[in-house]
């Protein structure tokens, strides 16, 4: 009844107009699952590799090769398998690929199959995905990290840091937190317009105004929070994605917008200064992806005061996370399903983090689709945090809307994480 009988792969477009892989998995009893794969702009060097076509078509970014691999080698390897045996399916693909970084089959091909199989298995059971994966204990609605100002690789402005986010930690429910975020977003738009600044939105729905420094961006967000009728640090906290690998050059953190340059110790002091000045509760990629000494120094300086999230540092890889836990680098992991390429490995990374006292943040990518799987995964794992962009663009709001549906399904059994999901 739950045997995989067919797999269909197609090339679709993501939110940036680039091709990506969508996969349908069909089962013997007629059950069905579908998943579309996201893609990043600023990618870590240690991420699993996407399969792209090369050549002139779509500027080399086509995924027809990946689709052929899904319908060919991958289908042959897992045809007839029980869709409810997720780990067996994922391990079969990992063995078939045979590389450390999924480079032979492509993480985009493998992930599409992995997630679609999970959706099909949930369909067999007649369960929503979060309940199928997480069981009866899946009931924590995550606190959102809402990206409202973009910089770095996500924007054409001088701001060195990639994302400036708000976290409505002081609201009583997910739906109220979402309303708060939307109201701050619109208050920020009004403030930027009044200052004569650009209010176009970037890849993740945040604004990309021409501001020169992190402090300028944080100041205008603080004003927007208050203008919307909320208290900074009480109702709404701040979070940063520094994406420091993007400006790490020859052992120095070069802030071109602010016209500053720091070694690891100096940059950790700079970040500490921001934490002292603003209600910042989370900093992502505060040090470069291979600056382990810098990460340890930053963690020693801010652990207990601020969540320190490893994205490029850990790339959702349990082996790199284990090294971080052992050496005292960071205190939380950003979880991106396409960084590792299978659902089983993603769940392993979350489990390792939470068991070790690390925080976990379920995350989108800058190139997204209408697929809302990560919303279900955030609830399934009870990780307590989700990062899925701003309060604009349907590729971002699709995840928030799915969480609203889940909140409604959970009813009184659901619990909003608030500040409790944070690692610090």
UniProtKB/Swiss-Prot annotation:
Write out the GO cellular component annotations: cell surface; extracellular region; phosphopyruvate hydratase complex
A single BP term in Gene Ontology: glycolytic process
Q: Looking at the keywords, is Lyase present?
A: yes
Q: Which InterPro entries match?
A: Enolase, Enolase-like_C_sf, Enolase-like_N, Enolase_C, Enolase_CS, Enolase_N
Q: Look up and give the organism this protein is from.
A: Maricaulis maris (strain MCS10) (Caulobacter maris)
Classification via NCBIfam families? eno (TIGR01060)
State the family it belongs to. Answer: Belongs to the enolase family.
Q: Which residues bind Mg(2+)?
A: 241, 284, 311
The name this protein goes by in its record: Enolase
